[in-house]
Amino acid sequence: MSIFSRLFGRKNNLTISSDIKKKDARSRNIAFVDTEVGLKDHKIHDIGALRYDGANFHQASQTALNKFLQEGKIDYICGHNLIHHDAHYLQLNGILIDTLYLSPLLFPKRPYHHLIKDDKLMSEQMNNPVNDCEKAKELLMDEIAAWNQLSERKRKIFTLLLQNEEEFRGFLMYVGAIEKDDAIIEVSEFILSEYKNHICANADIPALAAQSPCGL
């Protein structure tokens, strides 16, 4: 079973709201957020956040976190396993970027880049969510650098396949890679050109792209 098959146990049917679709990719005010949640009581015990301007937040208050983010006019909220962990406990108003799912895509030879068990980041100071925010920031910078090293054709392939998947859309918006929805018809040509020696020329790529874009 592939890494993506393990990460994506279900098919995502993401509906993108019109306000997010219209978001200016040049507006890049970002904050990094991490929570410490009790394993038994499933309650938030601590919250850490780090804004693009260097300001940090460290207390277990959703209300105070919202104020901190609003003061920074935050557009993007980034974290490690943010979408399927932290966002379940927090009411986050922003475009979400999750570094967890980008890692196997951009670092295929070391897919658990900067990761440890339970899908959390290694931290010099364990159980310190602010420190985890710093690590998430470092990982995002690495992922952006890796993205920029990809060929233009490969970036097109990843964007066309993944831009409507919630685990990837925020990142693709942040780097200004979103394509028009009807551009998906071009993905077969790009894939056959990029992987011509590794894929059957008769493969039904449109069907695969529709059924399992992450797996493809």
Tell me what each language-model feature is.
Residues 1-28, 214:
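N-terminal accessory regions of nucleic-acid-interacting proteins
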Residues 25, 39-42:
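A short catalytic or substrate-binding loop motif that flags glycine-/basic-rich loops and adjacent residues
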Residues 27-28, 94, 182:
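Sequence-level motif detector for i,i+2 pairs with an aromatic at +2
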Residues 28-38:
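Two-metal-ion RNase H-like nuclease active-site motif
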Residues 41, 50-147:
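Conserved DEDDh/DEDDy metal-dependent 3′-5′ exonuclease domain
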Residues 45-47:
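Short aromatic-glycine-enriched beta-strand elements
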Residues 79, 90, 204-216:
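Short, intrinsically disordered, charge-balanced linker/junction segments flanking boundaries
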Residues 115-194, 200-202, 206, 213:
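Acidic, Mg2+-coordinating catalytic module of metal-dependent nucleases/exonucleases
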